[in-house]
Amino acid sequence: MYSAEAPSLKDAVVRFGGGCTGEMISPDGLVLTNHHCGYSSIQRHSTLEHDYLTDGFWAMSRDKELPNPGLTVTFIDKIDDVTDYVRTELKKITDPNSMEFLSAKYLNGLAKAKVGEKFLQDNPGTEVEIKAFYGGNKYYMFTKKIYSDVRLVGAPPSSIGKFGADTDNWMWPRHTGDFSLFRVYADANGNPAPYSETNVPLRPKRWLKLSIKGVEENDYAMIMGFPGRTNKYYTSWEVAERRDIDNAVRINIRNLRQEAMLEEMLKDPQVRIQYASKYAGSTNAYKNAIGSNWAINKRNFEQMKNDEQDRLIAWSKKMCEPAYPEALLTLEQIVNDRKDLRFRSWMLDEALSRGIEFSKVPTDIGTVCE
């Protein structure tokens, strides 16, 4: 399943784009991913004359495959536990209020320092990053190889790939043909390279073999991929915060924005194509927030968390461990104290940063300048 020295299953499971999962399914660099993961790329290639979103797209030969500037496929070469290294470096920080222990910029600086500039220069396309797990209790360094020449091979029409649309999204069972196909290209040595007609299909270390036999009850099954993050360790106060602030703001603001988008999309086929990916991305998180709040209330999840906390307090008293209830009190106070700030932050993000597209221009300029 995992080996840093030899080809393993993890070499066939890739990060597609900014956060999706893909699977290498051929020795010629073919990548299988979701239709919704390839949706923005399909949209960028769509026009009124060639509406690939509506009609689908299939490259009949490799020279017909479509390049996608900005799209990447990332392979994980290895994962190292660097907890001791990070903790040693953190001890050098004298500011007691420092948040560096969770800072991506700081942690990635440590990653580059650990491997050295020569390693990165000798391995083109390789990047390293350190991620904090469990709120900074564990740290892992990921050594990644990132390919930027990724071409669209095929996608079904949205009537298949997006069947059920927003009505069926986040609902199960699903009946969607949610897939698209891309191909990763590399230089002649198999290294990452910018798009070039001279690039060749990447031969991955490992690719998945597809079975048409199907499965039966009690067959072994597993999932590998890049799911993002979990908030399963939220306290009851954080659960309420997610429901009453985070999700509430997202639902209210996105509902207004999506109504405006849809009105214009229905008027003009060109606008429909141009806004298809933005609308889909917005409605995806919108419906997730609605479903999350429904589940929190339906399952009485806040009370379930309260019960867990009460059991922890009872255990800590029995074991003479006062640090645990003290930590809970601290967390409760922090969540209560930040309510107004958190509401303002979510309103700023949803209503201004995401809601008014022109507001992104100064942000993008600032990013480029940095």
Say what each PLM segment does.
Residues 1-370:
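Terminal presequence/propeptide segments associated with secretion/organelle targeting
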